[in-house]
Amino acid sequence: MGKRLILAATGLLVGAASADWRLVWSDEFNGTELDASKWGYEQGFIRNSEYQFYTNLPENVCLENGCLVLQGRRVQLKNPDYVPGETNDWKRARAVLAITSGSVNTRHRFAFTYGRVECRAKVPARKGSWPAIWTLGANIGEDGWPKCGEIDILEFYGQMPDKVTCNVHGQSVETGKHATPGSSELRGKTPADGFHVFAMEWTAQEVVCYYDGIRYGAFPLEAYGDAFEKPHYILLNLALGADWMMPESEVEVDDGTRFEVDWIRVYQKESPVADDRSGTVSANSASSK
């Protein structure tokens, strides 16, 4: 606990020169409850035909020993949105909730343009676990996805425990359709063996991702219009399988199916270089869906 507080006070960076950066937002998760001024919850079936139903319940989202814990659970509950005979909407087609989990984000509370994000976290090596640290454009309510832009600082798949990935998504200015360069992968690591620092630097020209200071992904941004020139908000979630990934029965959900986040911090340049644009920070700026 003491080390974590010292790091916060000094603004120490992992894998970057601290002199050029200033801390503009952070959460050390040292309290007893999630800070409602910084975070909101996703609830329900949300995206990607994933199996988990997100809740705001303490068994799925809590603070424990100075960490945010997103915990997967096996349950047998009625789906409150179930519609008998539904075939077109996967969120309403499931009568029973078999898995619950947690997802939190800073939408409507904090958004930023350009800077460096660092997050010290531990991922679960459980089959089907899909924890992520990422951002979405705060204009998603008006422009939708993928036009709003998405930065995947970390995606980890529990069934592939020696690999971490990062990526960006946007809308092509040429085709008007979803575009992505494809994930960059770093193999030969063991991210589930303890806490590691996942980082991302975002400028007007590119997004660069790091694992424990190792640079392993760089993505030019000119192909996506202004999606990465506008504020983004932060998301932390633990997805658990999807119908395109594996059968629901094969997803491993037990007490160890937990995504632990020690801290997350956002930095921006004190003096942006001449060929970049200065970063911005905004509160309560994200638009409603």
For each predicted feature, which ranges?
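GH16 jelly-roll
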Residues: 19-285, 289
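General helical structural elements
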Residues: 7-8, 269
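Bacterial N-terminal signal peptides that target proteins for export
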Residues: 1-6
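Hydrophobic h-region of N-terminal signal peptides that target proteins for export
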Residues: 10-18
